[in-house]
């Protein structure tokens, strides 16, 4: 029986984890993508209503009253500042922090792989990510489907044109009436249906890329110029697990600022505290952000799947409950 001080991952599994990380670095070195290192804390943070941050106070010289700092939920904002400064293609493997659940697929502190490719759109980046997944997971080429196709295929309703009542009707067939019937926000309802009725059905044999999410869920992605109902965003699923979230990145600083402000208005309407907007990012976008695509991938989940394990604690030395 293991003792409380011991790692939850075996030494063998930690060595296998190290080998996967080494293969990822070799993959990017072969493509001349530069590894970078950015801060784990920032004076600003994400405004996304679905993300919850850790924060602390810096009380060093000049900050007698304390400076609030936020642990980064991803390295995205700092990496985009590097891109605007002319870095070219970059990647990072780092710790990220989200003040949310812990469990089979979640730990508040986790390892993220994030990379950006100037002159790529989201389809180009899906191609490259498919290469990486085949390397690490030893799987066949991924399948691809639009968000609309996935909804119609698995739930029989169009997420872009279906009425709220039609969406709630589908939720009732899934046994989700108690949650869905009082819901007034369309995106919340769509996310509920996707998580409960689509995610666990796609990508069972090979990874599945789902692209062109509703424009209302664009976040930091561009709107599709030929169909303004959808955003140039994708997610990746395998064995019912979300692995990654990628964008054809929004380059317009003014539009990004509006989206952040809209997020904060939504946070207030939901009884959540508005978050400080990263104005350094906004100015970096305004200064000249390259046309590019970027993606964030959960390393712990990826390695768990690569090793055919069923809990991220098996590939993490010290999860939150024994950290």
Curated annotation (Swiss-Prot):
Its keywords, alphabetically, are: ATP-binding, Ligase, Nucleotide-binding
Reactions it catalyzes: D-beta-lysine + L-lysyl-[protein] + ATP = N(6)-((3R)-3,6-diaminohexanoyl)-L-lysyl-[protein] + AMP + diphosphate + H(+)
Asked if the Swiss-Prot or TrEMBL record annotates the protein with the keyword Ligase, the reply is: yes
- Tell me one GO molecular function of this protein: ATP binding
The entry marks the following residues as binding ATP, namely 98-100, 107, 242-243, 298
- Please give the superkingdom of this protein's source: Bacteria
One Gene Ontology term, aspect cellular component: cytosol
A biological process (GO) of this protein is:
lysyl-tRNA aminoacylation
The protein's Enzyme Commission number = 6.3.2.-
**Protein residues bound to substrate:** 74-76, 116, 249
Keyword flag Ligase:
yes
SUPFAM superfamilies for this protein: Class II aaRS and biotin synthetases
Alphabetized InterPro entries for the sequence: Aa-tRNA-synt_II (IPR004364), aa-tRNA-synth_II (IPR006195), aa-tRNA-synth_II/BPL/LPL (IPR045864), EpmA (IPR004525)
Q: What general EC class does the enzyme of this chain belong to? A: ligase
Gene3D superfamilies documented for this protein: Bira Bifunctional Protein, Domain 2
Q: What does this protein do?
A: With EpmB is involved in the beta-lysylation step of the post-translational modification of translation elongation factor P (EF-P). Catalyzes the ATP-dependent activation of (R)-beta-lysine produced by EpmB, forming a lysyl-adenylate, from which the beta-lysyl moiety is then transferred to the epsilon-amino group of a conserved specific lysine residue in EF-P.
What is its quaternary makeup?
Homodimer.
What family is this? Belongs to the class-II aminoacyl-tRNA synthetase family. EpmA subfamily.
The protein here is known as Elongation factor P--(R)-beta-lysine ligase
